[in-house]
Amino acid sequence: MSKEEFHVSEGCFITEWSNTSDDPAMSIARARVPPGITTRWHRLAQTTERYVILHGEGRVEVGDLEARTVGPGDVVLIPPACRQRITNIGKTDLVFLAICTPRFKNEAYEEL
């Protein structure tokens, strides 16, 4: 698996750390959102996602919950099929791990 960063249409940059059929229970990716950028509304079918914030400051929106500010050490739980997006509200890159269970598959992704 390539560990090179790539841009996704959602509006952020992704580096896949672990996403193989050898470990179908989970995938781990590093996500980077530049300052001032909001990712597109999207959801993952039959996949629970967790954001583990590593660096920067963001505002995360999950389903019908009130938007909340997140920073290093915060964990965001995103249930399956729940709409989500995140905004970088800081002056530096917002960096977080996106941990999916089961592992991320393109066919589970839907932009809204």
PLM regions: where:
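A generic "binding-loop/recognition-motif" signal
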Residues: 37, 46-47, 66, 82-83, ...
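Short acidic-glycine-tyrosine-enriched beta hairpin
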Residues: 65-80
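Conserved short histidine dyad/triad with adjacent acidic residue
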Residues: 16, 29-45
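Ligand-binding loop in jelly-roll beta-barrel domains
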Residues: 22, 80-106
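Glycine- and acidic-residue-biased ligand/ion/polar-headgroup-sensing regions
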Residues: 46-48, 52-58, 63
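A short, N-terminal "cap"/entry segment at the start of jelly-roll beta-barrel domains
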Residues: 1-26, 40, 108-112
